[in-house]
């Protein structure tokens, strides 16, 4: 049985990760750290402990003090340029907090780290956002977890709480393409619940050492891998 912790639990993918962890028979405990109280499935609330704080500078110490120590730490934490008030602040928040929390998890003894990244992550990219995503990946890999799992989804299909008109239009196209044939969508867009199931399944496999050959330390899942590991019953 795995003890787990999660940040980003109120976002589109993170909320699905939380519900999948709560429903999974191999998960004994779920701790979340967030600015808002997550909307979790009430049926499995006995597994769930929530820490809610607007002061993100306290999150790392909260994570360090968790008992028992989470064996798997999941991060679906992200923000936007608009909500952060510009890219410089977005970088400080998204890169800074992700790396700080990963370091705290490693120092506490967490064995497996699971990150929701992006298909476009590239340290040599022209645009700042994919460079930031790549830098988060590289910095958490350098921490030397027993195993690091990185998911690189394409467009994340599903309903967001906040308004992103351009992204919403593209999600509509993805949804229409998926209704015609899943193959028209799966290569460049994945449903949020599928990404979440893939993250949970891959994290648990990594904890057991059941990872593909050559991915013993770092396991990167692209779009087709996310579809593969996110398929099946919805917990």
UniProtKB/Swiss-Prot annotation:
Predominant cellular place of this UniProt entry's protein: mitochondrion
GO biological process: one example: import into nucleus
Record localization: Mitochondrion outer membrane
Family that this chain belongs to: Belongs to the FMP52 family.
Record-linked Gene3D superfamilies: NAD(P)-binding Rossmann-like Domain
Record's protein name: Protein fmp52-1, mitochondrial
GO cellular component, one term: mitochondrial outer membrane
Mode of membrane association: Peripheral membrane protein
Superkingdom of this protein's organism: Eukaryota
